[in-house]
Design a protein with these regions (language model features):
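Long, compositionally biased stretches enriched for glycine and/or charged residues
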Residues: 1-157
Length: 157
């Protein structure tokens, strides 16, 4: 998933392969009817809520494990090449923290734009718009400074 976290996640399935066959060729067939794919996407987006429902609390093991793997990558271990939240400022998305196609290694965090279908990219655009709205609300409430002043706090932004 890319973009925001929670209901505004952009679930990308177009690069997934099942037994060597692209998922996009399976969706809408008897093997994976469109309705089942939609349910699967919903289950991915609502996975955290399901864990809380089943356990009565959030899961801490997976984030803890990923954190250790991220630290290991930055310290010289195998690169961590899973989507992760990163500060994004490019031609399309400006001044936002969102999950991207990232790699963490001894050079830090780098990202590239996810590649997806037009529908997936539209979901990512919608997720970005939602994140911008949330960011702008935080600015309005004086919780964070206006974007144009961020580089006063961190000159790398």
């Amino acid at each position: 998933t890319y973009g925001g976290h929670g209901e505004q996640m952009a679930v990308f399935g177009s690069k997934v392969k099942i037994q060597g066959k692209p998922l996009s060729e399976i969706i809408g067939t008897d093997a994976l009817p469109q309705e089942e794919w939609e349910k699967l996407r919903t289950d991915v987006v609502q996975g955290g809520a399901k864990i809380i429902q089943l356990r009565g609390r959030s899961s801490w093991q997976s984030p803890a494990y990923c954190s250790v793997e991220m630290i290991r990558a930055i310290m010289g271990g195998e690169p961590f090449a899973w989507p992760a939240g990163t500060y994004v400022k490019n031609e399309k998305y400006q001044n936002i923290m969102m999950a991207m196609d990232t790699t963490l290694d001894t050079n830090g965090c780098t990202y590239k734009m996810p590649e997806g279908t037009p529908e997936e990219m539209a979901l990512l655009d919608a997720s970005y718009a939602h994140l911008c709205k949330m960011r702008d609300e935080l600015v309005t409430l004086n919780i964070v400074p206006p974007v144009e002043k961020w580089n006063e706090i961190n000159p790398n932004l």
